[in-house]
């Protein structure tokens, strides 16, 4: 049976977890360039962990400049099997209030300035992202959040915007009323798509910080309010993460939903027509099927 290794992508506060043993910052090189930062690895309750600050320590990357491909490749290269994404989001629903967590299960991708696939000319691949998150891993996150006393909502649709500016009132109302989205953020895509291409189980937790700009009784998004809410959410996030090793266990069976076999029939380019340079770059992401 395979071994579990949990990867967490999120803010800098998440990796300051009591009980993380043998903590070491590792620099990981990838064919897609450097990841956002070095990756903190260690053991938590007997399970290997890897923490990657999405924007880098000190928040140096914009949502558009985050090296999403390098981040996912680096985690896969380290042996991560299960990726937990944690990010700040605005809410389109009254009942999803600031301080609440939402376990996402769907996305609408409105980003336009990011590389969204590991594949390309010379090695064409098409994976299904009909269900972009892993129900097994999402269920574990829900249990961990409830055990930590967090108000958590299971299921929600995330509107991924390019940023870095926040929405206009008209955009906010469009996404809420016409699109039927539940939350909005700037970093959920293409991260979820790339995790699927890398055959990683992926769960995403939206930490609600505000009501975006649609709400008639709340003002426009204020970054100072977001930072204040994030401070409290970081404590909740750490309490959730520290419960995950016990829920997932050190031994890992194949994903019942097929996340770890997403590339089984996805690559269409004939073997004799594949670009050797691109195939070499895919060694960690798709080595299982490319040989």
Regions from the language model: what does each represent?
Residues 189-224:
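Zn-dependent metallopeptidase/amidohydrolase metal-coordination segment
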Residues 136, 140-151, 239-247:
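Generic non-transmembrane alpha-helical segments
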Residues 1-131, 287-291:
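Metabolite-binding pocket within alpha/beta catalytic cores that recognizes anionic/polar moieties
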Residues 144-182:
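Active-site/ligand-binding-proximal alpha/beta "capping" segment
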Residues 213-261:
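His/Asp/Glu-rich mid-to-C-terminal helical/loop segments that flank catalytic regions of hydrolases
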Residues 76-79, 176-177, 196:
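Non-catalytic positions within long, well-ordered alpha-helices that form the structural scaffold/packing
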Residues 262-291:
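Acidic, Ser/Thr-rich low-complexity intrinsically disordered segments
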